[in-house]
Amino acid sequence: MAQASRKAVVAIAGSSGMIGSALAAALRANDHLVLRIVRRTPANAEELHWNPESGEFDTDAITDVDAVVNLCGVNLGQRRWSGSFKQNLRDSRITPTEVLSAAVAEAGVKTFINASAVGYYGNTRDRVVDENDRAGTGFLAQLCQDWEGATLPAQYAGTRVILARTGMVLAQEAGVLSRMRPLFSFALGARIGNGRQYMSWISLEDEVRALLFAISHQSLSGPLNLTGPAPVTNAEFTTAFGRAINRPTPLMLPSFAVRAALGEFADEGLLIGQRAIPAALERAGFQFHHNTIGEALSYATTRPSQN
């Protein structure tokens, strides 16, 4: 936080989501003050109103804030992609970031942490990438570039900006595992396509711990891969998840079937992957609680996610 010896004030946009709610709980557990940035009428003094579509936000409300964390964004796999939904994916990320970045710059907030994704790197195949690698190609890679680019006003103002390029977050109650578990429980879990595409993952516990680490470590800035240290192929993930819940995983879902069911999202989000590693986090001394996919899945499937 701003200083380890005093309570920090952290404002969070997107605090009702899986990551945001877990981060808010962890901050409060460490006796820090959390301000939730909400669209509705604030229920108490710890909520700040905004309307990102209209640009409405009271900059004065964050002049005494130590860090602003922006986790806004519609879920990529929420529905089959259409032109309008792809625009929604962009608008739900870029517009809030533009509003908050300008507000942070005007208010002089010292730290701005903005969500991004490892999709920034495009399809890396089996090539290992870290924060020094260039952006890839495709819709998601361009989306991430534009999303990160929306933080420029804060960067130009001298704010310490963290671009939190997150992988697949593993948690019990929400996220991808909660959607996959019913299929795997009936032995219907399957590798996707040839299963050789890489998946960069992180447990929810380590995701939150990494965000707390980024807030408190002033030496960190720029892109930060929030992923576990050992990315795995889709086939390896499928086997590990089946093992974690004691179910066989003998099936394979052909690429053509995935494309038929999910359209463009299949080629952008499931049939390609990123082999991203958390080089910047590890250089800064961050230590993961879950270093392997087996450890992360065992944790996420045998106990409630907590921090």
From Swiss-Prot:
Highest taxon of source: Bacteria
InterPro entries on file: DUF1731 (IPR013549), Epimerase_deHydtase (IPR001509), NAD(P)-bd_dom_sf (IPR036291), SDR39U1 (IPR010099)
Residue ranges crossing the lipid bilayer per the database entry: none
Pfam families: DUF1731, Epimerase
PANTHER family, per database record: EPIMERASE FAMILY PROTEIN SDR39U1, SUGAR NUCLEOTIDE EPIMERASE RELATED
NCBIfam families linked: yfcH
Family stated for the protein in its record: Belongs to the NAD(P)-dependent epimerase/dehydratase family. SDR39U1 subfamily.
The protein's name in its UniProt record: Epimerase family protein ML0860
